[in-house]
Amino acid sequence: KVIFDICGKQYEMKKDLDGDWYGVSDPLVVGFHYYFLNVDGVQVVDPASETYFGCCREAGGLEVPEGAEGNYYRPQQGVAHGQVRSVSYYAGSQKQFRRAMVYTPAEYETNTTKRYPVLYLQHGMGEDETGWSKQGMMQHIMDNLIAEGKAEPMIVVMESGDVKKPFVARPGKNVDEERSHYGASFYDVIIKDLIPMVDKTFRTYTDREHRAMAGLSWGGCQTF
């Protein structure tokens, strides 16, 4: 028995004469959706899908496309494209190696004397440092904004907010107090490890006027 699990609903799948499994869901809103398969009671990732870290685990993903209004996050011909690098570094505050995804604008490789402002961009609860560049297509958004003159060329840094596990308050504990500690290890990481590593590795402006932070959902909470 194979179950297709998407957007909080489950749909039983059927096997066709060619041996392929198929199912029909209710209409889905445009945008990106995580999904899972359940095979005889065991939740698995679709082996035919690229995997994405979401909902606190690896998941399949599908995109219900928007019309032309979604062009802002799609790669466009004639637009110079930046790079997203996977950067491993040692975080002394946590005594562990960590990974940051770092976007550099297209001109970074050729304008070798220029320094750049930095945006630290955080993902939502249950996701990781790859969320903005894989699911969110941040690099295409930045490329297009820069090409249109709507954004200054900048470096964008995405790191794990240490919120990969579901938030569960301990019995008898104040929920708001417990929530304030969720992902709190990241605060030491960004101040003591991540920012120093980025400023040492990339051509950045190192003053506070050229450094910003933003985030989605729990990443927004961490920003505040």
Language-model features: where?
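Loop/turn elements at helix/coil->beta-strand transitions in domains of secreted/extracellular proteins
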Residues: 114-118, 150-155, 207-210
